[in-house]
Amino acid sequence: MSTSVSQAEKSLLRGLNRLRSQGKLTDVTLIVEGHRFKAHRVVLAASSDYFCAMFADCAMIESRKEEVTLYGVSARAMSRIIVYIYTSLLELNVDNVEETLAAATHVQVKEVIDRCTVFMEQKISMDNCLAIASMAEIYGQFALAERAYRYICAHLKEFATTSDFKEMKLEQLHYILSCNYPIDIPELELVRLLCSYGFELQLKEEALVELLRLIKWEFISTEEMKTLRYQNHSLVEEYLAKVQETSISQETINASLDLCLRLGQGPTNMRGMELSLLKIGGFEWKGLTNEIMCFSTSKMKWYELTAIPHIDQCEQQSSHPHRDQLRLFRLSLIIHHPTGNFGTAVLNNELFIVGGAYDVCLKEYIHPFGFRYCPLRDSWVTIAPIQLDRCRFSLNAVGKQYLYAVGGSVEYEDSSEDALRRMSNVERYDIVTNTWTYMPSLQENRSQHAGVVVGDKLYISGGIHLATILASTWCFDTKTECWQELAPMPTPCCDHVLVAIDNRIYACGGWHETMRESRVLVEHIYAYDIPTNSWSVETKIPAPKFYSGVTTMRRTIIFVGGLDSTESIDRASSETMAYDVDTGKWWHHKDSWDTPNDVWESTCVTMYVPSCVS
């Protein structure tokens, strides 16, 4: 039986380390701080460019000496490095990692350097982020320094309250601002921080002016800029005149801010962020995926942003023991299987994934678990599970605090119509309290429907209920908490998507059934005019597909992937089509916008992500 390479390497290392420990065939002794380390030249040279140059070059006196004294490294660190060279084992902790990195950099053992940088990347926190950035720069680990600086920017609100902020070098602050890393405070607050920093360090006016030149003045309104004049800081007043001379025109400033207001769900600060198209989950040739792909409009390419996480514990307690057992069983599935048919929403530029289902051995398991993704910090956290396990429901954000979940296929101990009606088919999630609350129920229960929010009103249309495809449209006023039935859609429809631009709602995609119960694609985009409570045909879809992902990017409706109805095989598509509501024209850029793989049943959203990650 053949031995794998890894097993052979382990066997070789064990043999070499045994020879070293026994002092057999060793041909060099390293002396560090009075400590003696016996080793084999060839082993050291194979692992270190430093030792390779020392022992392979006959002109080097060390190549002929049996004992070599090393300076600039500690004996403890050298011991760890030699153990790693002979065993591939490296014991790192917060107390010895800097010492080990310094020694590994000195003797050029790349694998140890990499282990140290990975260890420190995982340990970056508010207490050490500046120290790690400074250390990384000293040892030339610029990727690690970038990670630390990006952490500082993503947590700038908290970092600014620490003593490290005032201890940050002027060159470091200038560097991170010039890199345009995303930050978690408004640009106006950044101006105040810089002024405070300048006052504390008693910077010369020229130095502060250089920092202020890096401010994104287009993200500060005229009224906000006036508030700076009331601060008790003379340098602010002096610089404002320079701003008027050097900044872009106020019309451009206002136009940029108006755009942010229209988009509604923008980040705290636009610095270093770009509006991007996200494709979430769905089916590909390899099956159901948890990947979240992102299309960068500046680089015109797709890349993997993140993935819907697996959770390994059930944090919520329930007063229903039987339901606890069911949820724990479903939890064991969520750890190992990708999810589908979940609810998706963007609130305050954070992505929420709630509920969904898993197919295991042709049986569907619905689960209640939820996740929240912050693109600024590239991090996921769990949220409270939804009260009624749901899939194929709508999830929509209202304002800056709430998510509304409506309808869907549900799973509960008593799933009768009467029981579900008593439970309510509508729930609201509060991001402040991390709780779900039942809301007034939608009279017509449904799943595979669509929902969209305009102002403080939630609109629901279509879907399936008791094997009947619906055309009805409803509106929920989140202020009065009342439902109102509106004009029905021109045709019954399910598995479609609603998007809103101005005071018009667009129903995109979906299908309905003929009298013979065969599925027929909806070939048009229908527009609902809110003021007149009427539907009309907006446009014909050039190549309609089943299960396309649909969203809007500014004033354009985008269709991603889907299943072609005209093909019996190879039905899946990677095509991305878009409809401009202002010009009434469709476009398709095959070489850039199309997804890397064929995809269907994915969910699409637009949100701001850091431009530096792509």
Stretch-by-stretch model annotation:
Residues 20-27, 573:
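A short, compositionally biased
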